[in-house]
């Protein structure tokens, strides 16, 4: 065999094991995207806490999650839509933008990706953790991974916080992925960054009470890891132990995302004109005019970040 000829059995062994099953591909994409979210976001929190706030501050933490979300969606978006959040997935299913049979696949991948991301982060910062607490795992270092409320916050206040913050998140996501709205099909490439900026805005405005988890996988996956990795059952309660906290960043975001999805459709989504024969879509900041016959059809075959059901594969 000539030296320039390649043996098919030795070329790209990983590629030869490619998965054609849609559910496997969705799982892998959501797993990796959520993993990226955790290592960037919680990694920024780790630097802040382990350096005793000398290296970074609260704003840096928000930027870390902004970048984690953006890169996570960039990575997973072309395959799964880049939900990275069980509450978002559930809300999409409620408004028929994600098939219900896919919801368990999305959620399993998201929770597992968050758990594995926490494990890798702990391995990277193991020496720094030990230097910080001498092996005495406390809620302070558990805060690297999951959210904990301020001492003054009641469970009712925490639940309201999570419902409202996730409501804003879901409305923003729907606005950014609605091709009839401002972003449109030509701005699709910017959606991951815009979703990251949306999370940044929520963090700056609503991060004081409990750190704005707004994502059950981002919160409970790492929380479960800490319970298994030496922090114990204290991670399921608020710092004083007066009530169980763990369920609030799970229930609140799910409820808030559903309300946000329904609210967006009620105020915006259901009211686009169906017939566009004599209606022009024009950006206020652009002289370009696009004339369409049906506002409910994409301007061209395209992929929509986040909304799995809106994705159309080009050929």
UniProtKB/Swiss-Prot annotation:
Record comment regarding domains: Aquaporins contain two tandem repeats each containing three membrane-spanning domains and a pore-forming loop with the signature motif Asn-Pro-Ala (NPA).
Motif (NPA 2): 215-217
Residues spanning the membrane: 31-51, 58-78, 105-125, 157-177, 189-209, 248-268
Job description of the protein: Aquaglyceroporin that may modulate the water content and osmolytes during anhydrobiosis.
Induction notes from the record: Transcript abundance is medium and expression levels are not significantly affected by desiccation or rehydratation.
Span(s) of short sequence motif NPA 1: 85-87
Localization, UniProt: Cell membrane
Residues bearing carbohydrate: 136
Pfam families on file: MIP (PF00230)
UniProt cross-references to Gene3D superfamilies, sorted A to Z: Glycerol uptake facilitator protein (1.20.1080.10)
Membrane topology reported for the UniProt record: Multi-pass membrane protein
Family indicated by similarity: Belongs to the MIP/aquaporin (TC 1.A.8) family.
UniProt xrefs under CDD domains: MIP (cd00333)
Keyword annotations: Cell membrane, Glycoprotein, Membrane, Repeat, Stress response, Transmembrane, Transmembrane helix, Transport
Signal peptide, first to last residue: none
GO cellular component: basolateral plasma membrane
Record protein name field: Aquaporin-7
GO molecular function list: glycerol channel activity; urea transmembrane transporter activity; water channel activity
